Design a protein with these regions (language model features):
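N-lobe entry segment of adenylate-forming
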Residues: 1-31, 35-49, 54, 122-128, ...
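Adenylate-forming
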Residues: 6-10, 36, 40-43, 58, ...
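Conserved pre-ATP/AMP-binding loop-to-beta segment of ANL
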Residues: 14-17, 133, 139, 149-172, ...
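Conserved AMP-binding/adenylate-forming
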Residues: 26-31, 45-92, 213-214
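Conserved AMP-binding A3 loop
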Residues: 29-34, 168-192
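Structural core segment of the AMP-binding/adenylate-forming
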Residues: 49, 73, 77-147
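Conserved S/T- and glycine-rich ATP-binding loop of Class I adenylate-forming
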Residues: 58, 75, 106, 167, ...
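Conserved AMP-binding/adenylation subdomain of ANL enzymes
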Residues: 191-211, 215-248
Length: 248
């Protein structure tokens, strides 16, 4: 997906809109597929510099931050396994997930109490090596925004690049009746959601689609990433915490 769709669209239509993002402070950002190609390459190179390699597990707790899309596609290019997670998790949730999946690194929002919960959980999570903060700073954490931007915007496909049956991502189930279970998906997974986007969401080429979901939920990947971009449409992302009737 990262090479065959994102990079290919960037080559074919460099100025094609991929995402319209509105932050909590109402800052508007427009990202083309060329932007996604370049920023995801920076991410792939950055993760590689940290010793993250094909098959390693990386958790993403990034709410609706635009950096999620950069990191997600970067991990796809590198072949590391992305594990999206919600910022509603607390210490014991993180500890269980870190150890069950063998998480090597986490990218975490600086918002709220989430990074503190990760710090507590990390004391009992021997596989976790890198804690990377996004949209802020924290003692003992790497600064994603400062560090990844120093890397090259070029990341080439190789004979060992991920594809087909290689693992793309992992979700944890809700754990309603027991401990959450891992649901793993391979690199064919995005193709299945072309139908989701085209026939359920009615996405169109050059259209703009809104899915409210936080990136920690499975809905975000089939509602605001894979299927929509396969339809060659853009996604609209509003990085909010709570909808207020008084705000416009």
């Amino acid at each position: 997906f990262a090479f065959d769709l994102v990079d290919a669209l960037a080559e074919r239509e460099p100025d094609k809109l991929a995402m319209l993002h509105i932050s909590k402070d109402k800052t508007e950002r427009r990202f083309t597929f060329t932007d996604i190609k370049k920023e995801s390459a920076r991410c792939a190179n950055y993760f590689k510099s940290l010793g993250i390699k094909k098959g390693d597990r990386v958790m993403l707790v990034l709410k609706r931050h635009y950096q999620f899309w950069f990191a997600m596609i970067g991990l796809n290019k590198l072949g590391a396994v992305a594990i999206p997670a919600t910022n509603q998790l607390v210490e014991h949730d993180f500890e269980y997930r870190f150890n069950a999946a063998g998480v090597k690194a986490i990218l975490c929002t600086a918002d709220g109490d989430t990074a503190h919960q990760v710090d507590i959980a990390s004391k009992n999570s021997p596989t976790l090596i890198h804690k990377i903060i996004v949209n802020g700073t924290r003692e003992g954490w790497r600064n994603f925004d400062e560090e990844y931007s120093l890397f090259s915007t070029h990341f080439k496909r190789t004979a060992d690049s991920p594809c087909g049956d290689d693992t793309l991502l992992m979700f944890f189930t809700s754990g309603t009746t027991g401990y959450p279970k891992i649901a793993a998906h391979n690199h064919k997974y995005p193709l299945g959601h072309f139908h989701t986007a085209k026939y359920w969401h009615c996405c169109e080429r050059d259209g703009l689609h809104l899915t409210i979901s936080d990136t920690g939920w499975g809905k975000s990947l089939w509602g605001k990433l894979y299927g929509q971009w396969l339809c060659e449409g853009a996604v609209f992302v509003y990085d909010f915490d709570k909808i207020s009737k008084s705000k416009k």
